[in-house]
Design a protein with these regions (language model features):
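Conserved RecA-like P-loop NTPase helicase motor core
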Residues: 458-464, 520-614
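Conserved helicase motor "Helicase C" RecA-like lobe of SF1/SF2 P-loop NTPases
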Residues: 493-516
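N-terminal targeting/trafficking signals and adjacent low-complexity tails
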Residues: 609, 613-663, 670
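Conserved interdomain hinge at the start of the Helicase C-terminal
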Residues: 459-487
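Signature of the SF2 helicase/ATPase Hel1-core->accessory helical subdomain module
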Residues: 22-25, 29-30, 129-145, 153-304, ...
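Conserved RecA-like ASCE P-loop NTPase motor core of nucleic-acid helicases/translocases
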Residues: 13-20, 410-412, 484-491, 495
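A contiguous, basic/glycine-rich beta-loop/short-helix subdomain that forms a polymer-engagement track
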Residues: 122-146, 157-160, 313-454, 517-518, ...
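A substrate-engagement module of RecA-like helicase motors
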Residues: 11-14, 18-147, 207-243, 250, ...
Length: 733
């Protein structure tokens, strides 16, 4: 509403930033239209959303791709999927890859491969010069006049559309995510798969037979002349130099493979079931795990792997330099048309190579006093790796890239404050350095009475192998009491998958549905279905199920940071910050987000169950204050079911009173009965429809017009309500 009023009254153009693309879509399809409708401003305030270039189909690339495919004997499935894409983008209304319905991917198996080859190339796509009628170009044009543009935080951090829409007035929703994801936004990343793809793009066509790329399953596309080959021709690079480039690329690929093979063929392959993650220098002697050698437990550290990575990176840098030198030797020739598209494309790709070289160089630098973490992550199956250079002082970068450009900024979230202060949020992002006003709004919901927070005193801790079994039994018993409508959240994907496999056997025997991921969320809205949804970190926010659709949220454990997490380990080490200071804000934000799934509207209530709350009483006491003074009750598993039944019955009694009062008022039932101006069957039907619209399962099954009595069934309880007495008492309240 503030954005709409500011746009309408003061003629301001604003950005609204959300955490995810799903929330973008919710704002565009639901929230903004509803507010405009309620204010009578439909058609008077323009709005839309935009994503990064690579989220859109490029018509030029699609047409070239189709032409190439026609000469390569494509299969029927490949042709049909290409025809679908061609028709999709006609007219410039469609072309957002993420908006393609999942059923399309089910019916056209080849479409994912096609989309990788036809999305907008950031180096080639220049909307101002594009003559095609494409969605992305149209959206860029609309930005110039659009009142409200919705983006996600990732795009906001690097906002590439400053010419069309400057960063002057922004509203940031779910702003708490910036404190954690800010490190990702400003990181420099080398991903081995992305690097391979870039090297594949620049590999000279005439020597492709000597490369490893020719043996890939998609080698058909490697046997064609690529755009970069045309760039080589524009630069008049000699065959001998192209051969040197090919040789350097081969050597880089060898080093990429050797980094992965080092782990796969050595002792590291047997010490962990998870991705290997460590800070290249500060955790070099951290223990990965133990192996038995000659009957003796031997500790394995990251030292050997770190040394191998450093050696390979030095060789990769050397070969990148060799490629860049050859290209730049010819790039400034006066005879070259520097305005040609192919020249600009090639130069941009060469700059990408330079950027990668610089990241490798910074990754290898080591200074205990600098403000970076150098993080290695190796895929557990040794198929991929990622090197990250992460800036630790994101306040400087946030101020430079965002705050310094703002006229006004509003940062919103239900979880910005900790211990009744926003200091953590403001200090992390540098907002404390600029003029700001802090406003903490008291919650509109009665958390203490509507939400019961429960932990267990007698089940095993999360590290125990029996933990998924114990959780599954409890969740299945909860689901019988709640008739489904339960969301089980997990900090660990592995634990989520194990629990799903156990829990589905219990639930199927009770005729309860179970869904393994967030795709099942929409089924919770159907009050006639009895379902349980398991979700990971993506479900901690953005889940909005009103009323009886969601009455229980469970959490496997308090989401504490791993003290050996490379980023936070580095922060603690370099700045002498203790674990509690680092962990508590992050943990509390996540718990508040999880609990916040329950109370979303006037008729919401429920139980928030944390299976492993830990043993630190001082942390739990502080957490209670941050959970709106909700007491965390630790009970044994035998008492638990009586405890939640009592809470649910008490809450439902309050909900029923509220929904009946609002329904009677909305339909003017009291006055109609007084005037004897009502058919009891019609009014009963109208009341029940109104109650269901409020996402409540209560049902009026009998009405006595003369006595003004109603009999209502709500779950397993029946209520007799006399409207005269009821409305009089509720009006007093």
């Amino acid at each position: 509403m503030p954005a709409i009023l500011e746009a309408r009254i003061n003629k301001k153009r604003l950005l609204i930033s959300t955490d995810t693309k799903e929330l973008q879509i919710q704002l565009i399809n639901k929230d903004i239209p509803n507010v405009l409708d309620s204010l009578g401003l439909n058609g008077k305030v323009s709005y839309g959303y935009i994503k990064g270039k690579n989220n859109y189909i490029c018509i030029d690339r699609l047409e070239a791709y189709i032409d190439d495919y026609e000469s390569q004997n494509p299969t029927k499935g490949e042709l049909l999927s290409l025809i679908f894409l061609k028709r999709l983008v006609e007219g410039g209304k469609y072309g957002d890859i993420e908006e393609i319905n999942y059923s399309v991917f089910d019916n056209f198996k080849e479409i994912s491969t096609h989309l990788r080859n036809v999305s907008c190339d950031p180096n080639m796509c220049r909307p101002k010069k594009c003559k095609k009628d494409c969605l992305y170009k149209n959206r860029i044009e609309e930005l110039k006049e659009e009142h409200i543009t919705v983006v996600n935080h990732s795009l906001l951090a690097k906002w590439p559309y400053k010419d069309e829409k400057p960063l002057e007035n922004i509203i940031v929703d779910e702003a708490h995510n910036l404190t954690e994801k800010g490190y990702d936004f400003f990181s420099s990343i080398i991903n081995s798969k992305s690097l391979r793809y870039l090297l594949q793009e620049i590999y000279p066509y005439e020597f492709i037979q000597n490369s490893s790329f020719i043996y890939k399953k998609y080698s058909r596309n490697m046997r064609k002349i690529k755009a970069f080959d045309k760039f080589y021709n524009v630069l008049k690079i000699e065959r001998e130099d192209k051969q040197k480039i090919a040789r350097s690329i081969n050597l880089i690929i060898e080093e990429i493979d050797s980094i992965l093979n080092f782990g796969n063929c050595n002792e590291y392959n047997n010490v962990s079931n998870y991705n290997l993650r460590w800070e290249l220098n500060l955790q070099i002697d951290e223990i990965v795990g133990k192996l038995k050698k000659d009957g003796v437990d031997t500790e394995i550290s990251y030292r050997a792997y770190s040394e191998k990575i450093k050696l390979s990176c030095e060789k990769i840098i050397k070969n990148l330099v060799s490629i860049i030198i050859i290209i730049y030797r010819n790039i400034d020739d006066d005879s070259i048309d520097k305005e040609a598209d192919i020249y600009k494309f090639g130069k941009a790709k060469t700059r990408d190579l330079e950027d990668i070289k610089i990241i490798f160089e910074i990754f290898l630098e080591y200074d205990e006093k600098d403000d970076y973490a150098r993080i290695v992550e190796i895929d557990k199956n040794y198929n991929d790796f990622e090197f990250r250079v992460v800036p630790l002082k994101i306040a400087d970068l946030f101020e430079e890239n965002i705050l310094s450009q703002l006229e006004k900024g509003i940062f919103l979230s239900a979880t910005l404050s900790l211990s009744e202060s926003m200091s953590y949020f403001k200090n992390t992002l540098g907002i404390d350095r600029v003029k700001n006003v802090e406003k903490i709004i008291e919650p509109i919901f009665d958390y203490k009475n509507r939400v019961s927070v429960v932990g267990f005193s007698d089940i095993c801790e999360y590290r125990n192998s029996e933990f998924p079994n114990e959780m599954s039994k409890i969740i299945s018993n909860i689901s019988k009491i709640t008739e489904g409508h339960t969301l089980a959240l997990f900090n660990s994907k592995d634990r989520q998958e194990k629990t799903y496999e156990i829990l589905k056997k219990y639930l199927h025997s009770f005729n309860l549905e179970i869904y393994a991921d967030k795709k099942g969320i929409r089924h919770l809205n159907d009050l006639n279905r009895k379902c349980v949804v398991l979700g990971s970190k993506g479900c901690f926010e953005g889940v909005d199920i009103p009323g009886d659709g969601l009455v229980c949220v469970t959490l496997d454990k308090l989401p504490n940071l791993n003290p050996k997490d490379p980023l936070y380990f580095t922060i603690m080490k370099k700045y002498s910050i203790d674990y509690y200071t680092i962990n508590y804000p992050q943990m509390t934000i996540k718990v508040k987000q999880a609990m916040g799934r329950i109370l979303r509207s006037k008729y919401d209530y429920g139980c928030f169950v944390i299976f492993d709350v830990g043993t630190n009483l001082s942390v739990l006491k502080r957490l209670e204050k941050d959970l709106h003074d909700c007491k965390i009750s630790k009970v044994n598993s035998n008492e638990f079911y009586t405890y939640i039944r009592r809470h649910l019955n008490k809450s439902r009694s309050l909900i029923l009173k509220s929904v009946i009062f609002d329904t009677i008022k909305a339909l003017n039932v009291d006055a109609k009965m007084d005037n004897n101006d009502v058919d009891k069957d019609i009014i009963k039907k109208d009341i029940n429809e109104n109650i269901r619209q409020r996402a409540v399962k209560g049902e009026v099954y009998h009405i006595d017009i003369i006595k003004k009595d109603m009999k209502v069934k709500y779950f397993d309880r029946n209520y007799l309500i006399n409207l005269d007495i009821f409305m009089r008492e509720e009006d007093k309240n």
